Every structure is written in structure tokens, then in C-alpha cells.
Amino acid sequence: MPKGAFLTLYGINNIGKSTHSKRLVQRLEREGYDPVYLKYPIYDFEPTGPELDAILRKGHGKDLTEVDLQTLFMQNRQDFEPQLRAMIEAGKIVVAEDYTQTGIAWGTAKGLEESWVEALNEDLLKEDFSLLLIGERAMHVKEEGHIHESDDELVKKVDKILRARAKRFGWPVIELQPTKDATHELIWAEVEKFLQESGVAKLASQGAA
């Protein structure tokens, strides 16, 4: 059975992760691959998804500790993992917006020991390729009431942690360019290099196998 790949795009909120993740999926399709887009947490995956949505966007769970919240994020990833693995084993390229490193960065920025949040997520599936987007936030799309978008100083801490982790793990770091097209081409250059080096098959090649 053909094996796909698991790609993750990281970055602070309001920096264009959704836009560029979806553009990457479109590019992969044009290039003959079989991609699928995911955004973590998986909000429609019960029971943890709707619960996280209510906490992050609707002000529920104010009595939750950060340990409780990060455990809930981890559980959402863990519960969805069988579906994630099935996609990859079927030959799909999964393009995920946010994943474990998001939780590690936010949990650490909010006062948890980095090593503890790392250990919490240790047993989850590891991505094959990660990329960090950096640059200025688009403040006009900031979601009012979202607990992780309303605190600008906290977002700056997260940005610093993500940059440090990118350096530690050797992720490509892409700075936002004046145009979306220019940013996309930088992203595509890194992804294409990874795909060529890893030998992920295109749809026609999978069918011939």
C-alpha cells in the first residue's frame, strides 16, 4: 500500500496559516499528489473537539487549569490519530495547520514546564516535515473572545518559543513576503524538496504500483 506523508505548518495566530495551508493543498493537487487539509484541534471530532471550541471561543471552562487544557488538546490529537494514520497509509499527504508543537509552545508560554508538555505529547504520531511561518500578524482578522488571540503579549511569547523550537529541530522558517504568491513559492520550494528527498509518490505512480 502506498505511504503518504504528514506535513505541519506552525506559526502564531493571524499570520496566514490557514491561507497558506490551503494554498499548499491546492498546489499539491496540481502537482499530482493526493493531499488533505486538517486544522488542529479537530473541532468537530467528539467529545473533545466541541469542548475545546467552547473553551477557546465561548468562554467556557474558566476553572480549567492549563494542565487540564493541554491534556484536552492532547486527547483530541490522540483520539483522531487512527484516522490520521489511515490517511497517510492510503497515500495521502496530510497538510495540518498546527499540531503538537502548537500545544508545547502555548503551554510553555502560559507557565508549564516545556519538558512536561513535551512528555504529554510524546506518544503521538510524529510529523514527517514541519515548517514555521513568521511575520506580522493580520490584526484585522483577530477573533474577539478567542482566549489565544486576545492576549498580544502572550502571542509574542509563543512566537519566541516557536522560533526557538524551529532552530532546535531544524524546521524551515518562512518569513511572510509582500504578496501571498511570493510566500507560497517559498513554502512550496521547501515542501517540494522534502517530497523529492522522501520519495512520496504521486497519484499516477501510486496507481501503477
Residue map of PLM features:
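P-loop (Walker A) phosphate-binding loop of NTP-binding proteins
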Residues: I12
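ATP-dependent small-molecule kinase phosphotransfer cores
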Residues: Y33-W116
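Hydrophobic anchor at the beta1->P-loop junction of P-loop NTPases
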Residues: L9
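A glycine- and Lys/Arg-enriched "phosphate-lid" helix/loop adjacent to the NTP-binding pocket
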Residues: D98, G103-I161
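ATP-binding Walker
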Residues: I15
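NTP-dependent small-molecule kinase module
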Residues: V25, E143-A209
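Walker A/P-loop
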Residues: S18
